[in-house]
A protein has these predicted regions:
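Transmembrane helix-loop-helix hairpins at the membrane interface
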Residues: 2-166
Length: 167
C-alpha cells in the first residue's frame, strides 16, 4: 500500500510540479506571467489524457502556476498537488475496501474538511502579510507562445500519446 501511495501520490506531485511549474513555467517566464501560467497549465491538462480530467487539471494547473508566481516557490503547489492526489487515493481505496457507510462518511469528512482548512490557510496567510492578487507581468503576446514550434511539438506529442494509449 505504501509503495502504491508513493507511486500514485508522492512521485507525480513532485515530478509534475518540478516539470510544469518549475521547468516549463520558468522557461516561459520571460514571455510574461500570463504565458508562464497558462502554457504549462494547458500541457498539464493534456497530459492527463481524459477530457474531464484534462479540464480539471488545466484549471488546477492555472491555480498552481499562479501560486508559484505569487509565492516564488513550487513547494506550496507541490503540497497542494500531493493533498489532491492523496484525497483521490483515499477515495478510491475506501470505495474498494471499506463498507459503503464508512466510505461515504470519510469522503464527506474529506469533502468538508479540506475546503474549510484551505480557507483557514488563506485567512492565516493574509494575516501574515501574504497578498493574493494577479501580479501578472507584461511580456510578449501570448499568441506567440502558443504558436511557437516547441510548444506545438509538445502539444502534438501529448495528443498523439493520448490517442494511442487511451484507445
Amino acid at each position: 500500500l505504501f509503495m502504491y501511495y508513493l507511486a500514485l501520490c508522492v512521485m507525480p506531485a513532485v515530478a509534475e510540479e518540478l516539470l510544469f511549474r518549475g521547468a516549463f513555467q520558468g522557461l516561459m517566464r520571460p514571455s510574461g506571467s500570463a504565458a508562464a501560467i497558462f502554457a504549462p497549465a494547458l500541457l498539464f491538462g493534456l497530459l492527463h489524457l481524459d477530457l474531464a480530467q484534462g479540464l480539471t487539471a488545466f484549471v488546477c494547473g492555472v491555480f498552481l502556476g499562479w501560486l508559484a508566481e505569487r509565492s516564488g516557490s513550487i513547494l506550496p503547489g507541490m503540497l497542494l498537488h500531493l493533498v489532491n492526489n492523496t484525497l483521490a487515493f483515499l477515495t478510491m481505496y475506501l470505495r474498494y475496501y471499506a463498507p459503503t457507510e464508512a466510505s461515504f462518511g470519510v469522503e464527506l469528512f474529506l469533502l468538508l474538511f479540506f475546503p474549510l482548512f484551505g480557507l483557514w490557510m488563506i485567512w492565516h496567510a493574509r494575516g501574515q502579510g501574504f497578498r493574493f492578487s494577479a501580479g501578472l507581468r507584461p511580456g510578449v503576446d501570448v499568441l506567440t507562445v502558443f504558436t511557437s514550434p516547441a510548444y506545438s511539438a509538445v502539444v502534438v506529442f501529448l495528443v498523439v500519446y493520448a490517442v494511442i494509449f487511451v484507445h
